[in-house]
Amino acid sequence: GEGKAVTNPMLDLDDFIGLQFTTGPDGNLYQLPDQQFANLYWFRKDWFDRPEIKKQFKAKYGYELGVPLNWSAYEDIAKFFSEDVKTIDGVNIYGHMDYGKRAPDLGWRMTDAWLSMAGAGSKGLPNGVPVDEWGIRMEPGSCNPVGANVSRGGATNGPAAVYAIRKWDEWLRAYAPPGAAAMDFYQSLPSLSSGNVAQQIFWYTAFRASLVGKDPNNKVVDANGMPLWRMGPSPKGPYWEQGMKLGYQDVGSWTLFKSTDVERRKAAWLYAQFAVSKTVSLKKADVGITFVRKSTINHKHFTK
């Protein structure tokens, strides 16, 4: 094609993660991934590993304290830390964190696969077909929406969606720190560094950089700056079935418009390839801890 002469032969498309998100229904690749982050489960591993806490939890619930596989176990853990443990090392602690301020990002809180984590939508990856993770039904073989309401074949007001929003509200009020309901996305997620939260079911990995490294205000690392926390797979809700999407992945990508002059497109394409080159991707991962290439994930910077 017209961009062949300005395409890096070392681009190595097979090295990218998230290509399925930038591939159309026709099988063609329409965008080039530049950055990505996921939404996962976050927890204080150091607290979960304390023998006295593990013993107390098992005595009450009859199973081992660990990464919850479902929302029921997550709620048990939230209730346990908020109402039974209450304080650790003299600090008041809570079993859950979230946000509820009326702001645009509260929309992301729901649309970033929260409904499908509960079990709304159809089976299929990266999106459910014919009903996606937003609960919107699509026309067969296209991205044209038909409807979101159950009466139109959608799922945004179905049992799983209603359950998901109810649990978001219940947990926020019952188990999160005071003031969490008045926080937005940008205040809530980095606030875990204050060190008073045991777990969070809906945590964006884009905020990892704010929770690592030596900083007197960062209470979730040890004396050497190593994280006291870990991430795990998203717990699934009661309506979730095998084959449904679980969790969320965001893939920011380069897109070049046909309407742009071809010479300007070529220049943009050269810059895009520079921005996602293996050396630049590695540097971006060192700083922001977001990954877009397999070679970055497997690099010695992150595998020691």
In which residue ranges do the predicted regions lie?
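Alpha-to-beta junction loops
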Residues: V91-I93, S193-W203
